Amino acid sequence: RTAARLIAEGEIPPLVLAMPSDGLWGDGSGYFSHHGKDFDRWIVDEVPAAAREAGAPVSDSSPCFIAGLSMGGFGALSLGARFGGKFQAISAHSSVTDLRELDKVVEESLVSELCRGEDVEVLQMILKHRETLPPTRFDCGLDDRLLGANRELHRSLEKEGIEHVYEEFSGGHEWSYWERHLEDTLRFFAEHL
């Protein structure tokens, strides 16, 4: 409804939204290669291909953006950094910024499985891929248990001179917060067409 309203009001252009859940064999398991498989490529390559195959009015040359919330915020920031050439911009809400924080937002942590030989911190992935990093924004609620980690990511990016947008708003780690701030993501994407 949010995107449809913003399109109808002329605030953003028409677009196709594909919103997968990462839940392969557990929360966060779709954001990395592991067990000898490139599971991270399914969001980067297969979701856009599936949208095209489903008849969405998009082509291989259509702009593609990545966004997420909570664990999906980790996915958006990390995949967006690692595969910067695939995305026009990145947006994230209430993000896990380090896989070792996963216990704060999921019931069954897979940290020991997910952290084998991979970068586990968003900051390290952004630093490693800073030359190809798309325009990036992220936000967090003032009552969110991940606020400190999001502030730290913001401070570290500022210290490293990496351009980004960071905002804080009232609210916590909850759907009402994310629903309110989806508009910020869509407007940010519209600015980067």
Task: Give the positions of each predicted feature.
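Non-catalytic cap/lid and distal C-terminal segments of serine-dependent acyl enzymes
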Residues: 1-193
